[in-house]
Amino acid sequence: MNRRQMLGTMAGLAALPALPRASDLIGKPVAIEDDPISVPSEGWITDVDGIEVGHFTDDRRPTGCTVILCRHGAIGGADVPGGNPGSRLTDMLQPLRNADESVIVEAVVLTGGSDYGLASAGGVERYLRERYFERHKAEPHPKPHVPIVPAAVIFDLFADQDWTIVPTAESGYKACEAATKGKVAEGCVGAGAGAAIGHWGGNPTKSGLGTASLKLGDTGVVVGAICAVNAVGDIYNPNTGKLLAGSRTDDGKNFLPILERLRAGKEVVLPPPGTHTTISCVATNASFESAAMAKIAQMASAAHARVINPSWAPGDGDTVFALSTGTLKTPVEHGAIGAMAAEVLKEAILRAVVNATGRPGMPSYRDMLRGRPL
């Protein structure tokens, strides 16, 4: 570029309208988007052959658990990018732990109740042990069998509720009994019953559980995802970059982005470490070993950064499980599945938000969209 062209370019730039300074936006409420975000109305993780899902939702207070059941087993992997996770058996799903051996998972548990809720995985183990004995009832002394049931938790204990009510082993067992291959209930059910978003600002919006699936053309490959969204951060529409839901103003009528508060250096209510998180499971019918599934889980976790901001915060315990049921034997590159897993998990996160139902004092996205904060 010569000097004349450069001067012309600079003159053109000078004629453009000035961009607003960050300081001009600080502390100003953000209006609700006029048009609700469009997310697929169909598709669930159960579209992956070999995957079933069951919920237990407690009717005494908002909490529960969700079981992703693999009756014939699935090769598992995991990624834990969150700062303060509450989980079970995630270490054995790391590639460095089992470099030469794949781990066969029979179920994954997503649960509320914080660490107390991990007890629900014991009920899932009991259910699977009983099914094992049913399959081997003709044998006088079946060999010992310990089902692998990884789990992750969200923090949904609130001082204004009886927080001693948490998912138990019986809750996990009932979720297994409810498991089906069909349509999966979304919103404030199972692990998403007590979920909320935008905690960092101190005045959150109700969230829940979402699921989605994606078929890769005519290849026969299916990728699915399910998640409970209880994020510290706000949720953004990836199509527009605009705030979708999250931290609200003190009067609760509008959203006030956490990032704007932080830019202003304003005091922000910091949640205690480990009190909030997004926990997820992605699955595919393509065949892979555990090392590849751990990489797929890691790639899928990119969905958090595309939709949640801030993501992977110190107060988050973000955990992503990945399962390969292996019913499709056609060779597929695992990087391609990881890329698609991130896309489908992004949709599941959005569905968790838009399908949530508000409760007194904590409106949902739909309540805010209609101008009816509770």
Question: Which stretches of residues belong to each language-model region?
Answer:
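N-terminal export signals
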Residues: 5-23
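A structural signal for small-residue-enriched, beta-sheet-centric alpha/beta enzyme cores
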Residues: 24-115, 130-374
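Feature captures the catalytic cores and cofactor-binding loops of soluble hydro-lyases/lyases
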Residues: 119
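Active-site-adjacent structural elements in enzyme catalytic domains
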Residues: 122-129
